[in-house]
UniProtKB/Swiss-Prot annotation:
Extracellular side: 1-38, 98-115, 185-212, 301-306
Family under the similarity heading: Belongs to the G-protein coupled receptor 1 family.
Transmembrane segments: 39-58, 78-97, 116-137, 165-184, 213-232, 282-300, 307-326
Source organism of this protein record: Ovis aries
Glycosylation site residues: 18, 102
Recorded GO MF terms: gonadotropin-releasing hormone receptor activity; peptide binding
Sequence ranges on the Cytoplasmic membrane side: 59-77, 138-164, 233-281, 327-328
SUPFAM superfamilies reported for this sequence: Family A G protein-coupled receptor-like
Disulfide topology: 114-196
Gene: GNRHR
Full protein name: Gonadotropin-releasing hormone receptor
One Gene Ontology CC term in the entry: plasma membrane
PANTHER family: GONADOTROPIN-RELEASING HORMONE RECEPTOR, NEUROPEPTIDE RECEPTOR-RELATED G-PROTEIN COUPLED RECEPTOR
Length: 328
């Protein structure tokens, strides 16, 4: 490295994306028992998520066909359709990639696929997170500013398009920073070891720290804050309305009135936020810990490490159950 960074700093930012392994010559990774369990659980969740999300898409399609041809899907069902597509994309890209990578341990697919799959992986993680933000914003506006939403029928389509666009743009740096490295075992037991990593792609160590923090913020912190704020506004608005007219509480027994629909919306958005928080918090806690202390890999047991990473794969499995229960 042609800079003034210390060796420790260089080591920190020349790390592998697959954070479950540590690449150091002479100590090359192997597929452990806990790794085999992780692979098994990963492919099991892959099957569950694929079945759940595909089933919901088919249910939406059948629901549409039963309606009159002149009617379109409601705005909420359009949003749920795009969230399902985003979850399905994450399922079909991230889970098989993680499972196969843990089986092979090293990277055999070459430089091009290293870059392309790294891009698709992050893109498929951005998309569902941003789509959850769109749903939260749309439901919040529908309750707090219903007239403004009705007067701007294209707002939902704009937010959906923006979510997909930002996902593709924010994942773009992956095409540049990821590449192949080749390591040799000091013991001479292996002829070579290839891995797809961000090895020394950043001029200085803090550049990677900034990129990691930006990615973490866009994938987790910002979406979570927006969902919490939107839910708080929905609760505040409904509480104020019911306080002004307590008799509306009795109307909630009917399935054909606005208060009941609003309460169902509140329950669904809260369930989304809860699932998002529960599933992704362990994953990012481990990731942040690794950013600030790469040696934590040697202190945290291998089973705990794999267990925390598996939490993230639960989210695309839970989402179709949530919106299937509350919307259809």
């Amino acid at each position: 490295m042609a800079n003034g960074d210390s060796p420790d700093q260089n080591e920190n930012h020349c790390s592998a994306i697959n954070s479950s392994i540590l690449l150091t010559p002479g100590s090359l990774p192997t597929l452990t028992l806990s790794g085999k369990i992780r692979v098994t659980v990963t492919f099991f969740l892959f099957l569950l998520s694929t079945i759940f999300n595909t089933s919901f898409l088919l249910k939406l399609q059948n629901w549409t066909q039963r309606k009159e041809k002149r009617k379109k899907l409601s705005k909420m069902k359009v949003l749920l359709k795009h969230l399902t597509l985003a979850n399905l994309l994450e399922t079909l890209i991230v889970m098989p990639l993680d499972g196969m990578w843990n089986i092979t341990v090293q990277w055999y697919a070459g430089e091009l696929l290293c870059k392309v799959l790294s891009y698709l992986k992050l893109f498929s993680m951005y998309a569902p997170a941003f789509m959850m933000v769109v749903i939260s914003l749309d439901r919040s506006l529908a309750i707090t500013r219903p007239l403004a939403v009705k007067s701007n029928s294209k707002l939902g389509q704009f937010m959906i398009g923006l979510a997909w666009l930002l996902s593709s743009i924010f994942a773009g740096p992956q095409l540049y920073i990821f590449g192949m490295i080749h390591l040799a075992d000091d013991s001479g037991q292996t002829e070579g070891f290839s891995q797809c990593v961000t090895h020394c792609s950043f001029p200085q160590w803090w550049h990677q720290a900034f990129y990691n923090f930006f990615t973490f913020s866009c994938l987790f912190i910002i979406p979570l804050l927006i969902m919490l704020i939107c839910n708080a506004k929905i609760i505040f608005t409904l509480t104020r309305v019911l306080h002004q007219d307590p008799h509306k509480l009795q109307l909630n027994q009917s399935k054909n009135n606005i208060p009941q629909a609003r309460l169902r919306t509140l329950k669904m958005t809260v369930a989304f936020a809860t699932s998002f928080t529960v599933c992704w918090t362990p994953y990012y806690v481990l990731g942040i810990w690794y950013w600030f202390d790469p040696d934590m890999v040697n202190r945290v047991s291998d089973p705990v490490n794999h267990f925390f990473f598996l939490f993230a794969f639960l989210n695309p499995c839970f989402d179709p159950l949530i919106y299937g229960y509350f919307s259809l």
